[in-house]
């Protein structure tokens, strides 16, 4: 007995995705390939976000990924930010961003 996930070489559960597709009333019938493809898409997105968040963690001198790292990863990536534009991440905080007009004036005299 081999799971459909292992047949497809995936970590994400093909059977569970298939069940959700059936239970969700998205269509009358669900093809055999659809849940495999969708599980692969989910897995790719998860890997992409975790990769970026994993890079953000050491930058903040941490060894563990926290919601803040996920937030920074998503908001600093143009495509992920577009995809997850309407998503709020709990405990994510905001991107550091100060409008240019609010910054102190650069004067030629100040360079001592």
From Swiss-Prot:
A cellular component term from Gene Ontology for this protein is: nucleus
State the protein's name.
Histone H2A, sperm
- Organism listed in the record: Lytechinus pictus (Painted sea urchin)
Keyword Iron in the entry? The reply is: no
Q: Which UniProt keywords apply?
A: Chromosome, DNA-binding, Isopeptide bond, Methylation, Nucleosome core, Nucleus, Ubl conjugation
Q: Chief subcellular site? A: nucleus
Q: In its keyword annotation, does this UniProt entry include Nucleus?
A: yes
For this protein, the record's PANTHER family field holds: HISTONE H2A
